[in-house]
Amino acid sequence: MEPPGRRECPFPSWRFPGLLLAAMVLLLYSFSDACEEPPTFEAMELIGKPKPYYEIGERVDYKCKKGYFYIPPLATHTICDRNHTWLPVSDDACYRETCPYIRDPLNGQAVPANGTYEFGYQMHFICNEGYYLIGEEILYCELKGSVAIWSGKPPICEKVLCTPPPKIKNGKHTFSEVEVFEYLDAVTYSCDPAPGPDPFSLIGESTIYCGDNSVWSRAAPECKVVKCRFPVVENGKQISGFGKKFYYKATVMFECDKGFYLDGSDTIVCDSNSTWDPPVPKCLKVLPPSSTKPPALSHSVSTSSTTKSPASSASGPRPTYKPPVSNYPGYPKPEEGILDSLDVWVIAVIVIAIVVGVAVICVVPYRYLQRRKKKGTYLTDETHREVKFTSL
């Protein structure tokens, strides 16, 4: 009899795992007989929330994203097919919003980046030569709500104009009556007559022109007296640029007399600060070449450190030349013998060779005589006489 209060489970213990397995099989079958999430696109987005799976024949719809607009008749929907894939669809039906067309500015150009006016791209502006840009050089196509507009107003190209060039002391320029100069308009400067004996020199470029950004091409020149001293080179002479006076950019050339060499440049120019550039050269005396022949050495001269050389009969400082200690290359010195010119190890080799040769000459005959004695003589037991015989 079963104990009271205990009820029997209506399902045997083996049935619960079986039911769970059956449910998983049914769920797997339902998944395998469906489509996964629909594809995503750059220009379109799914209407509604996506599901983990879709049944066969189920349809999903798309709409154009912000910044894009729909152009029919291309489809913007797809259907889950029997082979568990989505029918082909693309976002070609959605086009980017474009900004309004911009004309080329007068005397300039508007260049769209990548050749398009679509939002997210840029428009670059450039002006023709002789004109400069007023405004933003780059505009951006942006979205304001659902409309694409440019980030600013298009710039304009203005003609390059320059104010009159500066006036200079002791000089003037052409077109001094003109108040406004256009691009590449040029003026030329010149110096006034000098009140003294030396004229004014024009330092700098005589002609300048109105350039980019309404700025003159160079700084204005100046007029002043430039006079260099007469160049004098001792032990030399002037070979070109002769004159009594040397003004701005005067050029002179020099050469030295025989027995002298030039220290410096042979050509000098009178600079704007009334000095020669480079400095006036010098002509220095050519020193005689030093003798390279070593003095003759006597065999009677001792090499001891205590031996003193004989005093020179000439007064003044003694020469610092030291005779070389090496032998003449190839042959011994005339005053040396053959043995003096040989190295110690060479002499040692010769001595050893002589000793070995003498030893060989002495030992060979001795050994020969010893062998002859052993073969040709013997002593008898009776008379102990020496008997000689000759073998046949």
UniProtKB/Swiss-Prot annotation:
Changing S240P: In AHUS2; no change in cell surface expression but reduced activity. One of its GO terms (biological process) is positive regulation of gene expression. The keyword Repeat applies. Residues 367-392 are cytoplasmic. Residues 1-34 form the signal peptide. N-glycosylated on Asn-83; Asn-114 and Asn-273 in most tissues, but probably less N-glycosylated in testis. N-glycosylation on Asn-114 and Asn-273 is required for cytoprotective function. N-glycosylation on Asn-114 is required for Measles virus binding. N-glycosylation on Asn-273 is required for Neisseria binding. N-glycosylation is not required for human adenovirus binding. Extensively O-glycosylated in the Ser/Thr-rich domain. O-glycosylation is required for Neisseria binding but not for Measles virus or human adenovirus binding. One of its GO terms (molecular function) is signaling receptor activity. Residues 35-343 are extracellular. Residues 35-96, 97-159, 160-225, 226-285 form the Sushi domain. It is linked to Hemolytic uremic syndrome, atypical, 2: An atypical form of hemolytic uremic syndrome. It is a complex genetic disease characterized by microangiopathic hemolytic anemia, thrombocytopenia, renal failure and absence of episodes of enterocolitis and diarrhea. In contrast to typical hemolytic uremic syndrome, atypical forms have a poorer prognosis, with higher death rates and frequent progression to end-stage renal disease. Interacts with C3b. Interacts with C4b. Interacts with moesin/MSN. (Microbial infection) Interacts (via N-terminus) with measles virus H protein; this interaction allows attachment and viral entry of vaccine and laboratory-adapted strains. This is Membrane cofactor protein. It comes from Homo sapiens.
